[in-house]
């Protein structure tokens, strides 16, 4: 694997080791929500094309830093905290709106909780594209929050099968392989105008809707009576246990 770590270990914001790099692909898992990143020299930096990031949170600095280093047809995949999809504090909402309106946000994926050993903060994936080759004016939303499998009391994982499913969904949406179709509760392709109508919030759950469930023919009154009886039984059992 070819690599270039730069001339020296340094702060990538204030002492950028790759100022002229314009990459075809970028993958990044920057630290979430870091608050001590700002330096006065970053005011008006050319990387902040969509707005100056808040000085107390680097999430939108990372997003714009990656976009700045993409080539004309480059793509980036970035892991960030879930809050980045909806935060409106200190200019973040305005930056996100500018990015959406510029059509550089391609795919948003909400991940299951407890994927990381070192943090319980829920995470998401941002897929950015300098110039979309397929589906301009749309964003693909995937809600994978319920697709994790617990491998211990405190740790979840995405199985290879689920990863393949997500990858196939993105590929189909891009027109690379297979046919794409919206799936309630899982994925939906959304026009930029609809996203703007939601205040440019990028949380997938807001757009994909609820998963379709099989209906049944049981009348509501009968179902309510059955549930009430079960509740009474559980309350009685609880009282009996409390009396022991």
List PLM regions with ranges:
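A conserved structural/catalytic subdomain of Rossmann-like adenosyl-cofactor enzymes
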Residues: 12-244
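Conserved SAM-binding strand-loop segment of SAM-dependent methyltransferases
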Residues: 2-10
